UniProtKB/Swiss-Prot annotation:
Associated pathway: Carbohydrate degradation; pentose phosphate pathway; D-ribose 5-phosphate from D-ribulose 5-phosphate (non-oxidative stage): step 1/1
MF GO annotations: ribose-5-phosphate isomerase activity
Subunit: Homodimer.
Protein name: Ribose-5-phosphate isomerase A
Active-site residues, Swiss-Prot/TrEMBL: 103
Gene transcribed to yield this protein: rpiA
Organism for this UniProt entry: Tolumonas auensis (strain DSM 9187 / NBRC 110442 / TA 4)
């Protein structure tokens, strides 16, 4: 299978976790787009979706899937999203698509996080993929200085404004051996909206696409 075929395979496999007449949390990115396309085939069997980005909302609505505001939902069963990296502890780096804050919020409300990814995203130690940090524009340079103190090399992602009207710093050069601790430390820096570490709330199930098919990993 090609990488695109692996993404389609895990998107299709995630449908097995969708229960009838429920609300589905939907992430953002190319792999999630494959899930959204697959979800359209059973759209009459679900209540609605909660979306983590304007891009996913547009795709869902274009396929005739109702999107509801997270503020109108108390909880829902599953949140389906991709990852830029995922380690054996089911901790992830996310935010390559700049939707990390809304993704983290929607994931927090879901009972279960279903991560869908191709095998190239599996790593033993996270950090080769630059760690995204969403920041208030006023604080960008201050946050960058603090991130350098942690051993990282933050690079401003020029030309990108998040759905929250904030900016992204991509932190290169980290070897993340304690993701839970680093997530807390970075989130405490004034001016940080959130860091793209999903460790405090990691994945419960990972559907990993490879040339041999889809492998299911559970926490």
């Amino acid at each position: 299978m090609t990488q695109d075929e692996m993404k389609k395979a895990v998107g299709q496999a995630a449908l097995a976790y969708v229960q009838p007449n429920t609300i589905i949390g939907v992430g953002t990115g190319s792999t999630v787009n494959c899930f959204i396309d697959a979800l359209a085939s059973i759209k009459d069997q679900i209540k609605a979706a909660v979306s983590s980005s304007e891009a996913s909302t547009a795709r869902l609505q274009a396929l005739g899937i109702t999107v509801v505001d997270l503020n109108d939902v108390t909880e829902f069963d599953i949140y389906v999203d991709g990852a830029d990296e995922i380690n054996p502890h089911m901790e992830m780096i996310k935010g390559g698509g700049a939707a990390l804050t809304r993704e983290k919020i929607v994931a927090a409300v879901a009972k279960r996080f279903i991560c869908i990814a191709d095998a190239t995203k599996q790593v033993e130690v996270m950090g080769k993929f630059p760690l995204p940090v969403e920041v208030i524009p006023l604080a960008r340079e201050y946050v960058a200085r603090e991130l350098r103190k942690l051993g990282g090399n933050p690079v401003y992602r020029e030309g990108v404004i998040t759905d929250n009207q904030c900016q992204i710093l991509d932190v290169h050069g980290l070897q993340i051996t304690n993701a839970k601790a680093l997530e807390l430390v970075i989130n405490q820096i004034p001016g940080v909206v959130t860091v793209g570490l999903f460790a405090q709330r990691g994945a419960d199930v990972a559907l990993i696409g490879s040339p041999d098919g889809v492998t299911t990993i559970t926490k």
